[in-house]
């Protein structure tokens, strides 16, 4: 029902100076709200009754975040500020992406995962103990790295997947991946982006994880459970064997 929806659900699409934002139910802390950009009327539609609605809203900058990427919206009658994001944002370089989102201060690295084949079986690998400053240096030093224009036309040989947070804009456990052929890929801001940092840089990062971090391998077990003739109400999925391979 319409009256049970939040303002960000009712009035999700917001257009400001030709840029299309999509509001999400993530609060922007008052101390992160910058100067007011404009006041406007936002529109929403109840698809069940085909009724249309309008509401007043104020748009603000988010401190240290480019308005090309995101802004804050405050709806009339609502004291909270909400994130609204521009999914159509397309940076030209990795440096622009870093600066526009203040990634040095807003991006958090969580888990580092990979996969490898050993003795004919695929194994998932989890790395721990990575120095976050070293990771940043290895992956983000080339600020002139160009953004890929036609990402959908390329096939990437993925090497490492990094779980990242950008909580200021409402992202938790999002993917930032590194390919063996030298690309960084991410879906931050809701659309795929890729930057070419070069094969040498990618190999340097992979080598750092392999040689300087602790790695634990998990064997993928696709075997069928042995049939015993007895039914069970529990899960029949086979367990996953795990063992440490590097201290």
Q: What are these model-predicted stretches?
A:
Residues 1-247:
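Function-determining sites in protein domains
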């Amino acid at each position: 029902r319409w009256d049970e929806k939040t303002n960000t659900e009712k009035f999700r699409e917001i257009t400001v100076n030709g840029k299309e934002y999509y509001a999400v139910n993530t609060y922007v802390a008052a101390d992160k709200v910058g100067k007011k950009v404009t006041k406007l009327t936002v529109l929403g539609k109840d698809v069940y009754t085909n009724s249309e609605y309008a509401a007043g809203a104020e748009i603000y900058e988010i401190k240290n975040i480019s308005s090309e990427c995101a802004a804050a919206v405050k709806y009339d009658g609502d004291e909270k500020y909400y994130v609204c994001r521009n999914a159509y944002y397309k940076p030209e370089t990795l440096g622009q992406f870093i600066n526009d989102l203040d990634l040095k201060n807003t991006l958090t690295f969580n888990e580092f995962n990979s996969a490898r084949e050993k003795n004919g079986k695929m194994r998932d690998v989890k790395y721990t103990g990575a120095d976050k400053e070293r990771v940043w240096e290895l992956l983000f030093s080339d600020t002139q790295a160009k953004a890929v224009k036609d990402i959908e036309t390329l096939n990437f040989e993925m090497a490492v997947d990094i779980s990242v947070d950008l909580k200021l804009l409402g992202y938790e456990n999002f993917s930032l991946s590194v390919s063996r052929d030298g690309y960084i890929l991410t879906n931050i801001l809701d659309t795929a982006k890729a930057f070419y940092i070069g094969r040498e840089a990618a190999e340097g990062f992979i080598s750092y994880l392999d040689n300087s971090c602790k790695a634990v391998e998990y064997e993928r077990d696709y075997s069928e459970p042995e049939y015993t003739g007895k039914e069970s109400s529990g899960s029949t999925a086979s367990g996953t064997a795990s063992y440490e391979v590097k201290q």
